[in-house]
A protein has these predicted regions:
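RNase H-like, Mg2+-dependent phosphodiesterase core
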Residues: 1-204
Length: 204
């Protein structure tokens, strides 16, 4: 699917003496509702998974094909989340870090190095390297991006059964025209991020 060597970054760090490297990615920073989620994945060194790349470049069908393959072959993986209430309390950046920490804490073994997608980092209790667009160039981050995207999408589909009036199964909580129309008609639900809706309600 891509000519990119998805193990180039990891191999650079393996050569520097790191032995256990995990990739970390998040999903759900931007939506108006639901949690922000993170995944941490440790794949066997240089494992080739055909089609592995940034989850955003894949169809939902392809992500769901890769989801069990990643879980089956991973040495370890963890999923963490921070709720909409925590997002409102501590802000989305800190909540994202909290979800990442919880994902790392779920790993059955401690990595020597965590590769984090993006350009912001905090103290996770393990050495960290940020990788801009890491989900497109790092196998471990790409695997994490797929696990976390499918996991969060499924959570929002489940929430759609509880709050059917918002269309969560379609937009997954993002601020689409239909979502804002539902907010206008029905008001906010228990899983909406009120800090994200201040501007919207300020215009009412």
């Amino acid at each position: 699917m891509s000519s990119v060597n998805m193990w180039e970054i990891e191999n650079t760090f393996f050569q520097q003496g790191y032995n256990v490297i995990c990739g970390v990615d998040e999903a759900g920073r931007g939506p108006l509702a639901g949690p922000v989620c993170a995944a941490a994945v440790i794949l066997p060194s240089n494992l080739e998974i055909p089609g592995l790349t940034d989850s955003k470049k894949l169809t939902d069908k392809k992500r769901r094909e890769l989801f069990p393959v990643i879980k089956e072959h991973a040495i370890a993986y963890g999923i963490g989340l921070a709720s909409e209430k925590e997002i409102d309390e501590i802000n989305i950046l800190q909540a994202t870090f909290l979800a990442m920490q919880r994902a790392l804490d779920q790993l059955s073994m401690k990595p020597d190095l965590a590769l984090i997608d993006g350009n912001r980092e905090t103290d996770f209790g393990v050495p960290v390297k940020t990788v801009v667009k890491g989900d497109s160039i790092s196998a471990n981050i790409a695997a994490a991006s797929i696990l976390v995207k499918v996991t969060r999408d499924d959570m929002m589909v489940a929430y759609a059964n509880v709050y059917p009036q918002y269309g969560f199964e379609i937009h997954k909580g993002y601020g689409t025209k239909a979502h804002y129309a539902a907010l206008t008609e029905h008001g906010a639900s228990d899983i909406h991020r009120m800090t994200f809706l201040k501007k919207f309600y300020g215009t009412k």
